[in-house]
């Protein structure tokens, strides 16, 4: 990509995107997590829309923007609930209060909702959309419009696994909401089955790797549903490294065949 006219802009966006993800992984305050979550969505959108003169790229960026906004909306709802119920944004203080809220209900209109279950639904919905789970996976194959280094970041080592990392970070909460674990198992199983079956019928090599990523993230979410958080975190790191190298290799292959991605 040394011949690209805006190579400096790409390098700036890649560094900002990676910094946002690192910030998300190390912060232990819900407000900072929300801030990093928004930054990840913003910079991923700018990376997908890097070739902004292409019609298909603009459509892919719009699709990414819509799903990113939905994910951010559920994250913001969870943040507001944490302020109203926990009266703090520090995760360590929130986790200490969770056992005492096992029978706490909130009222929305004339309906009573179990607070921990509703709170966990907001979190897994936000993380599931970002992790391209079933019904929210459609933005990920189109995100291949980004340059290959950005695709390696978005698809493997940062963006999609950020949703899984969010679920692992709030794993204490899911120990008190058993039905949420069932939802994670169901969604993860559907995603890994759909991603692997759909990938078999792909002729585009980049989309084949994209659906492979969707399938592997389904494995991770399903493992979170079984409360195997240590194993999921280990597999997350291994998958991120291997898939990042695979994307770079695919990009080199496409470049070798003069941009042809049809297998």
Region roles according to the model:
Residues 1-33, 42-263:
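Hydrophobic transmembrane alpha-helices and their helix-loop junctions in integral membrane proteins
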